[in-house]
Design a protein with these regions (language model features):
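Conserved DEDDh/DEDDy metal-dependent 3′-5′ exonuclease domain
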Residues: 1-99
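Conserved "right-hand" nucleotidyltransferase catalytic core of DNA-directed polymerases
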Residues: 60, 64, 68, 77-279, ...
């Protein structure tokens, strides 16, 4: 039946509606048949206030989407909800037709193809060496703990006089404020500050400070970043040994993609500290047939 229809207008049709209909009804809705109003909304204004959901568009157009959550069995309320969704999508398509007059049809066709490719990428995921990652994480965390202990020996707790007693505040190596205070006590003259006047402490700035304490802090921040990445990858690794990060193809004002759960665009470059080790964790299921 799908062959008899020239165009399907759907909101999130490329990623959801068309694949679901093909799976459940045996239809063969092709990518070229789908006009996806979600992609159009994102393409014409990536940072649209309120977002791109059909519900948000219902509020903008003064035609509320409605609220229905129980899809256990078919009933008249469900049908009414479906019909209202359909009418709202029709109104949205009309609205976006006007918005899209300044855009070429090729721009939409390109984004539609990209979305389909990214959907396949998300479905496939990336093979991940979980065992090696956990071993690598343990190695880095061990050094982290050593630096934490070393910092406690170098910087004794600060004494704070309260009304009735003396309180001792231990040094926190993860506190940039405390790091700035202790380095200033050792003679450091910071040159970069926030708008509120707080000292800016970063890995890059610490690398320029010729003090062994500053180098220790810089090293700790590096380990903190790498262990954070490793933990996110390990947590996201599924039972089949693959990680499937989410990718939003049209989420930034410049049209660049946005990534999360985890951010697969943040894998360190091979030339950066521990970059080679991090990248070696990403592999292929069958090295005889695939390469990464």
């Amino acid at each position: 039946w799908s062959k008899q229809i020239d165009q399907f207008i759907m909101h999130n049709g490329v990623s959801f509606d068309a694949p679901i209909l093909n799976r459940l009804t045996g239809s063969n809705i092709k990518l070229s048949q789908v006009r996806d109003t979600l992609i159009e909304s994102q393409l014409y204004n990536p940072t649209r206030e309120g977002g791109h959901s059909l519900s948000s568009w219902g509020q903008r157009l003064g035609f509320l989407k409605g609220d229905y959550n129980d899809f256990t069995t078919f009933n008249e309320d469900m049908l009414e909800y479906c019909l209202r969704d359909t009418e709202l999508t029709r109104k949205l398509a009309h609205k976006l037709s006007k918005e899209g007059e300044k855009f070429s049809s090729k721009s939409y066709e390109l984004e539609r193809k990209v979305r389909a490719i990214v959907d396949q990428q998300e479905k496939n995921g990336f093979a991940f060496n979980l065992r090696e990652a956990m071993s690598f994480l343990a190695t880095l965390e061990e050094e982290q703990h050593e630096l934490e202990n070393q910092a406690q020996e170098m910087f004794k707790p600060k004494e704070v006089q309260l009304k009735t007693k003396v309180k001792y505040i231990p040094f926190n190596i993860a506190s940039r404020k405390q790091i700035a205070e202790r380095l200033e006590e050792l003679g450091w003259k910071p040159s970069k500050f926030t708008d509120k006047g707080n000292v800016i402490v970063s890995e890059e700035i610490l690398n320029t400070v010729k003090m062994p304490e500053a180098q220790m802090f810089s090293r700790y921040f590096l380990l903190q970043k790498r262990t954070g990445l490793l933990k996110a990858w390990i947590e996201a690794c599924q039972d089949d040994g693959r990680v499937r990060g989410r990718v939003m193809t049209l989420r930034t004002i410049t049209g660049r993609m946005a990534h999360n759960s985890p951010n697969m665009a943040q894998v360190p470059a091979v030339y950066s500290p521990y970059g080679k080790e991090c990248r070696s964790l990403w592999t292929v299921s069958n090295p005889d047939t695939h390469v990464l």
